[in-house]
């Protein structure tokens, strides 16, 4: 994690979460649990050295790893599990299923599991270089002057892929015989404490320590010719530089920088994959002690993984042959720089060459999201090496609406350190998809069945959880590099919502969530000494109605290496181990013993030549020894250990040499000086029994108690072991050393410890709950403990409603049910919780003697009554918290009383006559006003009405906030609200809020004043001159119906005009109304709004608004139509652009019976679908119904009735000019047969062909069938040829201009037979008006006049038709 305060890199790299979906686990191999320390160096290991390098499993030729005091987090293997929870979250269940077969590799040692397999993500083997130097047959001066080549060119190019190299050794005998010795590289098994102290000092202080016991781990030196040093020219020691000089220009390097896809899934992810830096460095001989060179890396690179302590793995460069430091490392992580400062090694040796092989990491802080072609570069000296990679972060785990991601972001592990086992951090992204989740819960658990050596743990003692809320739309770093300053810390909001489980788990209840959260879990490792620990932690997000999303993270361990080479030397060493089976031979599973002193003496001179202390894994190494015989002595053995038998078996590398032995160094290291020791073990224990007679002594009939926990501790109180008694009450601690121990017995549930040491027989009496046991060369089976069953008692009584508030239970007062009562012990710890029953009773059972605290929760709406009011503790109230004592009997005296305090709310409703919003002395209350009381949720609680004085009151109310609503009384209007400063005198309006807080609230008033009423009306008159205005001579019309509607269209009044035409509506409020006049029979509506004067007619329907005044301006006029001289011009202009095809088929049957009186009734009904009714009745009774339906919907109905009793020139000019581009073809074929019987024998053949062609470009097809029946009876001898040519040329942009100017002058009418019915365009029969009567004295002139008029009309249409054609 990057420390953003001081810009110092602390740690950052965590594992990126799943590559599979729903449930995945990432397995890393990290840190120093398998420390493969060393360098890609010059000289190789001999065969014996390879064997000596093994720790506990030499026969397997496999390097094993001891527990590290300081595990580092390096690079990890990726191992995944996939799980999909198919259960809905309502059940809150999880199922974990493992997939895949992987093996965890820790250094060279594997962890094999049935369902998990992993490969070492960053396992570095020590590489040794080859030397082609061959010895000359004899030494020459030239040879002596030759510069020492620590490594030839070939040595600078080891097989980096194989991590192995072969050494061509020099001759090893004095006769200069050539011997080619080849050896493969191996790894040295060490514990991390071996590299801790010195490495940290070097990193921090750039110092060089020569303390062997504290030295960094170096490799055994390579096999070399005996006299090789005689051929080396050691440079004269030069004085150190007076000041440090940058010698980057004197450094040459051959470097590779490789992106490593650790899990080989073709996806590169920071902290999951890594960079491999390998370089062979040549140092110019001009370089002096104190000079330095640098390694600079780009900001996309960082030099340690999850563990900030791992930085020491990129530390000093040492010569593995003699352990000398060539250059010390100093890190400047803020500037991405490593500075290497040379020691005097470069002053004493020429042609120094060094090799480094580091795993370095990608910095997710600078790579927040997936990105292609990200550059990584490292500059060693002045040479820069670059590489690029496409970074592809995995997606979050998403299952329906649930989404989650997680990674370990910091781990510091100290294996074998009980006081400080280390810690780790996991960062979890909760709901990164920002979905709306219901009942969202996050479960974090440090457990997986496939990882039994999991050293993670989660519990409230060691775990700290931080929770941050992510702003909407914020982009989270996909490498889990979180800047918490940009987030909101909401940890305190969720502290009470974190529940820790017994199985190393914690559950965080987020409730309903619609944003993302970052959860950081910081917890400690479990103490472990395992050589192959793993860390696994699972996370699961669940919510209602969605499947859970789960994943996990896992870690394993390995390390880095670097080094250089110089003069080869010899070493003595090997191993001190605990020989558990005491057979004197090292076997698999037997561990090393640390802190044993090893001293080496020259066996010839008895001079001490070296000393070492075994490391924690039991290994030791004493360097810089020439060939010869040496005595090796072991001392300072751990207390209580004894030496195993020596020289057992025939393998000197596996047997024990004893406390003192002589070994020989002859041209190679001798790593066979071992010592086996063992510790004698003893047992401690005995018996736990039920002491039924409570005498503290085991009797024959008393039986053991099974399942009792017994704990063994050392003298310092540290827990060593825990066991439980068996079915017979027996227990035993085994494999114990001599010493003093503490034994603690846990009191079994329901029991009480018996008397301690009652008798003189220590094997039969009880030692109590805690005792001391001593082991001194023998078992101790005397530690017993007795218990008897604890008697149980009850505590409780009663919770009642103290209606009279006197603090005592009265016979009429009843219990309160559902009251929560809590029982606590003297320490305040909750023991039980219960609720009172329906009668107010409660009881706690199964209690032992003791003092208890009882707490009563005040029920909602109640107040505790007074405490201890009487002398009878059985009926008085003990209050909400009291103490109860149980002493060998039940205690049923703990009571608590409560009462309900109630209050009133109300005041006054008055008539505010002056409308000032304030109650005045002379203003009186309004009775009968409805007042409603509601709670805060608008639920109606009560309704009252004001009394005769305007007062109202709501009683028996609890504390709280209420709403009061006043209903406006009929005929009143609410006055102004809160006009004054006196809340008790002003008006609170129709709706107000009242608060009751331990007192009545009588301040809620409402004032009203009487609403003024208004009138509406005026006049309906006979408009004799039809000018639309009332003239002084025109009179009113009586009994005209007038209807009044409100704004909603509801009828609220109906009246009729009086004898003077007047009407009126009274008692109206201000508002909008509609007045409707019903037209009197036989009258016609006069023109409306002809002037702005209020004397004009307003029409049949009038909208009017009354605003604080009467309105007497609503008039209407009617006139009677003149029946003698009807001059009617009806212009119907309708523009409708309507294309209509109108076929007008008109069958006209003209039957004419001509007596001497000829009634020629030519009734032609021509229907052309345009609702244009031109009905013209002349003497010839010609009904021309031109019904042309064009989409113009224009109804022009021109009815002109001309009676034969009047002289009327019926000049019917029907001009239906409807411009609609409407080509309406109307073929009106009218066959008119006129049969006329007359005294003068005249046949009147009225043949009327009506051809109506109307072309109308109209999209609507209108078929107009018109049947025209022309029956004419005439008494005259006339040949009536009725040739009716009707051309209906409807050219209508819906411009229908129908001028029906009927001027009909009829003198006398010949009596005619009236026609009974005709058909309109709705096919409904209707009677036609008669055109004359028998007493009119009419002659045939009318008939002929009508015929001529009709003929003229036909000719006009015919002419138009021809023109159209």
Curated annotation (Swiss-Prot):
Signal peptide residue numbers: 1-35
GO cellular component terms, semicolon-separated: extracellular region
Gene3D superfamilies, sorted: 2.60.40.1280, 2.60.40.1290, Immunoglobulins
Membrane topology classification: Peptidoglycan-anchor
Annotated region described as Ligand binding A region, given as residue ranges: 36-568
SUPFAM superfamilies assigned to the protein according to its UniProt record, in alphabetical order: Bacterial adhesins (SSF49401), Hypothetical protein PA1324 (SSF117074)
Pfam family, one: YSIRK_signal
Propeptide segments, given as residue ranges: 1332-1365
Feature: compositional bias, Acidic residues: 1091-1101, 1118-1304
Compartment list: Secreted, Cell wall
InterPro entries according to UniProt: Adhesin_Fg-bd_dom_2, Adhesion_dom_sf, Fibrogen-bd_dom1, Ig-like_fold, LPXTG_anchor, SDr-like, Sdr_B, SDR_Ig
The keyword Secreted belongs to this UniProt entry's keyword annotation: yes
Annotated motif YSIRK-G/S signaling motif, positions: 23-34
Biased composition (Polar residues): 62-71, 94-109, 146-155, 163-173, 860-869, 972-981
LPXTG sorting signal (motif): residue ranges: 1328-1332
Family, as annotated: Belongs to the serine-aspartate repeat-containing protein (SDr) family.
NCBIfam families attached to this UniProt entry: LPXTG_anchor, MSCRAMM_SdrD, YSIRK_signal
Subunit relationships: Interacts with host DSG1; this interaction increases S.aureus adherence to keratinocytes.
Identification of the protein by name: Serine-aspartate repeat-containing protein D
Biological classification of the source: Bacteria, Bacillati, Bacillota, Bacilli, Bacillales
Name of the encoding gene: sdrD
């Amino acid at each position: 994690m990057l420390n953003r305060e001081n810009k110092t890199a602390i740690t950052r790299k965590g594992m990126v979460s799943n590559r599979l979906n729903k449930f995945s686990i990432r397995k890393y191999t990290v840190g120093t649990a398998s420390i493969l320390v060393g360098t890609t160096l010059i000289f190789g290991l001999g065969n014996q050295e390879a064997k000596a390098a093994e720790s506990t499993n030499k026969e397997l030729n496999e390097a094993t790893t001891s527990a590290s005091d300081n595990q580092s987090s390096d690079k990890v293997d990726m191992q995944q599990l996939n799980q999909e929870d198919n259960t809905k979250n309502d059940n809150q269940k999880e199922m974990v299923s493992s997939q895949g077969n992987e093996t965890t590799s820790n250094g060279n040692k594997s962890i094999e599991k049935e369902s998990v397999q992993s490969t070492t993500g960053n396992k570095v083997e020590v590489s040794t270089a080859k030397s082609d130097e061959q010895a000359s047959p004899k030494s020459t001066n030239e040879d002596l002057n030759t510069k020492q080549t620590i490594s030839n060119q070939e040595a600078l190019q080891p097989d980096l892929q194989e991590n192995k190299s072969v050494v061509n050794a020099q001759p090893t005998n004095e006769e200069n015989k050539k011997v080619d010795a080849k050896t493969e590289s191996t790894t040295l098994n060490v514990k991390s404490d071996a590299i801790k102290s010195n490495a940290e000092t070097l990193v921090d202080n750039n110092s060089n320590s020569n303390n062997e016991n504290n030295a960094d781990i170096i490799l055994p030196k390579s096999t070399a010719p005996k006299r090789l040093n005689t051929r080396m020219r050691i440079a004269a020691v030069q004085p150190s530089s007076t000041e440090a000089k940058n010698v980057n220009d004197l450094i040459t390097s051959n470097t590779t920088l490789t992106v490593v896809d650790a899990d080989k899934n073709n996806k590169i992810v920071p902290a999951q994959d890594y960079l491999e830096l390998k370089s062979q460095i040549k140092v110019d001989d001009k370089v002096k002690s104190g000079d330095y060179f640098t390694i600079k890396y780009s900001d996309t690179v960082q030099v340690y993984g999850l563990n900030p302590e791992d930085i020491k793995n990129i530390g000093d460069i040492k010569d593995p042959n003699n352990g000398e430091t060539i250059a010390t490392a100093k890190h400047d992580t803020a500037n991405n720089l490593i500075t290497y400062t040379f020691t005097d090694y470069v002053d004493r040796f020429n042609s120094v060459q060094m090799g480094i092989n580091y795993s370095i990491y990608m910095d997710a802080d600078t790579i927040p999201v997936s990105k292609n072609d990200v550059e990584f570069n490292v500059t060693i000296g002045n040479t820069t090496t670059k590489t690029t990679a496409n970074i592809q972060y995995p997606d979050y785990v998403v299952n329906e609406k649930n989404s989650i991601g997680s990674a370990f972001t910091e781990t510091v592990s100290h294996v074998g350190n009980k006081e400080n086992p280390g810690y780790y951090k996991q960062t979890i992204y909760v709901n990164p998809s920002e979905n709306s989740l219901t009942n969202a819960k996050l479960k974090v658990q440090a457990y997986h069945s496939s990882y039994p050596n999991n050293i993670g743990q989660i519990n409230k003692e060691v775990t700290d959880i931080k929770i941050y809320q992510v702003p909407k739309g914020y982009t989270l770093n996909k490498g889990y590099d979180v800047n918490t300053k940009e987030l909101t810390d909401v940890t305190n909001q969720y502290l009470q919502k974190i529940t820790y489980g017994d199985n190393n788990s914690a559950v965080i209840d987020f409730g309903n969530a619609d944003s993302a959260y970052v959860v950081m879990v910081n917890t400690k490792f479990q103490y472990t000494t395992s050589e192959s620990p793993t860390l696994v932690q699972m996370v699961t997000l669940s919510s209602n109605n969605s499947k859970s999303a789960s994943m996990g993270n896992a870690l394993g361990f390995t390390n880095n290496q670097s080094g250089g080479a110089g003069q080869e030397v010899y070493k003595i060493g090997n191993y001190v181990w605990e020989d558990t089976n005491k057979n004197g031979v090292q076997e698999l599973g037997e561990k090393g013993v640390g802190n044993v002193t090893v001293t080496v003496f020259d066996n010839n001179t008895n001079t001490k030549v070296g000393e070492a202390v075994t490391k924690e894994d039991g290994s030791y190494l004493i360097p810089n020894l020439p060939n010869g015989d040496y005595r090796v002595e072991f001392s300072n053995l751990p207390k209580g250990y004894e030496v195993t038998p020596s020289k057992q078996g025939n393998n000197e590398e596996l047997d024990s040499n004893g406390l003192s032995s002589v070994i020989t160094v002859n041209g190679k290291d001798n790593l066979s000086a071992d010592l086996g020791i063992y510790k004698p073990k003893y047992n401690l224990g005995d018996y736990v029994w039920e002491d039924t007679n409570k005498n503290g002594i085991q009797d024959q009939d008393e039986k053991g108690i099974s399942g009792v926990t017994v704990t063994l501790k050392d003298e310092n109180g540290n827990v060593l072991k825990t066991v439980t008694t068996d079915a017979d009450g027996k227990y035993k601690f085994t494999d114990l050393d001599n010493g003093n121990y503490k034994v603690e017995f846990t009191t079994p549930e329901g029991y009480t410890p018996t008397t301690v040491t009652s008798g003189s027989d220590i094997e039969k009496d009880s030692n109590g709950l805690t005792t001391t046991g001593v082991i001194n060369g023998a078992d101790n089976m005397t530690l017993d403990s007795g218990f008897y069953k604890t008697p149980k008692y009850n505590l409780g009584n009663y919770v009642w409603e103290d209606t009279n508030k006197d603090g005592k239970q009265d016979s009429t007062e009843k219990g309160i049910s559902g009251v929560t009562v809590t029982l606590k012990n003297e320490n305040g710890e909750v023991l039980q919780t219960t609720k009172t029953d329906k009668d107010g009773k409660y009881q706690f059972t199964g209690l032992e003697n003791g003092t208890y605290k009882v707490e009563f929760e005040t029920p909602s709406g109640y107040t505790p009554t007074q405490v201890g009011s009487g002398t009878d503790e059985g009926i008085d109230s003990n209050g909400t918290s009291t103490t109860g004592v149980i002493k060998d009997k039940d205690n049923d005296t703990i009571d608590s009383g409560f009462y309900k305090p109630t209050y009133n709310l109300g005041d006054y409703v008055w008539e505010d006559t002056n409308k000032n919003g304030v109650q005045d002395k002379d203003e009186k209350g309004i009775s009968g006003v409805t007042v409603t009381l509601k709670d805060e949720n608008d639920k109606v609680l009560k309704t009252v009405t004001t009394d005769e004085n305007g007062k109202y009151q709501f009683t028996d109310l609890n504390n709280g906030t209420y709403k009061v609503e006043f209903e406006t009384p009929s005929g009143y209007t609410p006055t102004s609200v809160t006009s004054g400063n006196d809340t008790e005198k002003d008006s609170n309006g129709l709706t107000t809020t009242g608060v009751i807080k331990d007192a009545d609230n009588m301040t809620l008033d409402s004032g009203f004043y009487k609403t003024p009423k208004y009138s509406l009306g005026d006049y309906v008159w006979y408009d004799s001159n039809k000018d639309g205005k009332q003239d002084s001579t025109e009179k009113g019309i009586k009994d005209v119906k007038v209807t009044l509607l409100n704004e909603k269209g509801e009828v609220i009044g109906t009246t009729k005009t009086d004898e003077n035409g007047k009407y009126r509506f009274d008692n109206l409020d201000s508002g909008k109304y509609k007045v409707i006049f019903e037209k009197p029979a036989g009258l016609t509506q006069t023109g409306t709004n002809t002037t702005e004067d209020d004397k004009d007619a307003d029409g049949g329907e009038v909208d009017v608004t009354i605003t604080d005044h009467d309105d007497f301006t609503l008039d209407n006029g009617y006139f009677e139509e003149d029946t003698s001289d009807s001059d009617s011009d009806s212009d119907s202009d309708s523009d409708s652009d309507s294309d209509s095809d109108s076929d007008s088929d008109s069958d006209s049957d003209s039957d004419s019976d001509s007596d001497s009186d000829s009634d020629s009734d030519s009734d032609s009904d021509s229907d052309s679908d345009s609702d244009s009714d031109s009905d013209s009745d002349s003497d010839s009774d010609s009904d021309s119904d031109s019904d042309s339906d064009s989409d113009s919907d224009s109804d022009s109905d021109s009815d002109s009735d001309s009676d034969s009793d009047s002289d009327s020139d019926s000049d019917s000019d029907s001009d239906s000019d409807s411009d609609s581009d409407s080509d309406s073809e109307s073929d009106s074929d009218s066959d008119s047969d006129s049969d006329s019987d007359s005294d003068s024998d005249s046949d009147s053949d009225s043949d009327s062909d009506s051809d109506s062609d109307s072309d109308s470009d109209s999209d609507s097809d209108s078929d107009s069938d018109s049947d025209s029946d022309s029956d004419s009876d005439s008494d005259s001898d006339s040949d009536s040829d009725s040739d009716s040519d009707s051309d209906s040329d409807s050219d209508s942009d819906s411009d229908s201009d129908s001028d029906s100017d009927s001027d009909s002058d009829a003198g006398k009418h010949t009596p005619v037979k009236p026609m009974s019915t005709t058909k309109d365009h709705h096919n409904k029969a209707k009677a036609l008006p008669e055109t004359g009567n028998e007493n009119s004295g009419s002659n045939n002139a009318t008939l002929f006049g009508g015929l001529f008029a009709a003929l003229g009309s036909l000719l006009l249409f015919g002419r138009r038709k021809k023109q159209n054609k």
